[in-house]
């Protein structure tokens, strides 16, 4: 006779993936804050390219279906949702270049881009939900940092999609200027292909020289300004 699975078996208690919803936004609204923006960034980890932040205020009556953490979506689905978000929500985008990242650090550059995205919204936010551990300093409204926020809040999820698609498009344009690095394929992350290009050519002006793998590498081809801050 096959033994029964004990009640505390991991088979019976597998983690259920989080699905973002509108509860955090409604909680803020109940506290008197409206509209509520979600904010997130893309590109903290790559060796090259900007970090891009987005802020999104969703229309509660026109929330696109299928919003989720951008990392959980295919590139095609991100593109589809990107178009829907721009058509139905208030959106603002800002970036910090690799130069800004090297001058400060990736955390400060990310928060600065997020602050500029939030402050540039056509409709000022009364409250902000951000992904991660920090709310950017210098905002004109209160906010809440939400760990795994892009899996909990549809507004943050929307911002994560906008930031990711925008940055991927920037790196696709960079590929036309510096084709030998393969930016279109890895969007700046430290893949074997990317590291081989750096070893062969040296870094270009999009590389983050403050990042450990690049600190002792000689300069390669340069470009004045592909991506402005």
Curated annotation (Swiss-Prot):
Cofactor note: Manganese or magnesium. Binds 1 divalent metal ion per monomer in the absence of substrate. May bind a second metal ion after substrate binding.
Annotated transmembrane regions: none
Cofactor needs: Mn(2+); Mg(2+)
Keywords: Cytoplasm, Endonuclease, Hydrolase, Manganese, Metal-binding, Nuclease
Record-annotated RNase H type-2 domain positions: 34-223
A GO term from the CC aspect: cytoplasm
NCBIfam families: PRK00015.1-3
Name the UniProt record assigns to this protein: Ribonuclease HII
Native source species: Rhizobium leguminosarum bv. trifolii (strain WSM2304)
Lineage, broadest ranks: Bacteria, Pseudomonadati, Pseudomonadota, Alphaproteobacteria, Hyphomicrobiales
């Amino acid at each position: 006779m096959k033994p029964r699975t004990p009640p505390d078996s991991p088979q019976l208690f597998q983690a259920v993936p989080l699905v973002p919803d509108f509860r955090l936004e409604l909680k803020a609204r109940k506290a008197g804050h409206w509209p509520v923006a979600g904010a997130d960034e893309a590109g903290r980890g790559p060796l090259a390219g900007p970090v891009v932040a987005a802020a999104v205020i969703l229309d509660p009556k026109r929330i696109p279906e299928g919003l989720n953490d951008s990392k959980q979506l295919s590139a095609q689905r991100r593109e589809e949702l990107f178009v829907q978000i721009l058509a139905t929500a208030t959106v603002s985008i800002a970036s910090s270049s690799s130069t800004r990242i090297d001058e400060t650090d990736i955390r400060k550059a990310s928060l600065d881009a997020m602050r500029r995205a939030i402050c540039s919204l056509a409709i000022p936010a009364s409250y902000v939900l951000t992904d991660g551990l920090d709310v950017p300093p210098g905002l004109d409204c209160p906010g809440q940092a939400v760990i795994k926020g892009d899996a909990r809040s549809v507004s943050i999820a929307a911002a994560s999609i906008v930031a990711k698609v925008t940055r991927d498009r920037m790196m696709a344009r960079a590929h036309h200027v510096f084709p030998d690095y393969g930016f279109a394929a890895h969007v700046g992350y430290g893949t074997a292909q990317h590291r081989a290009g750096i070893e062969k050519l040296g870094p270009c002006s999009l590389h983050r020289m403050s990042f450990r793998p690049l600190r002792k590498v000689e300069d390669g081809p340069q470009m004045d300004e592909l991506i402005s801050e």
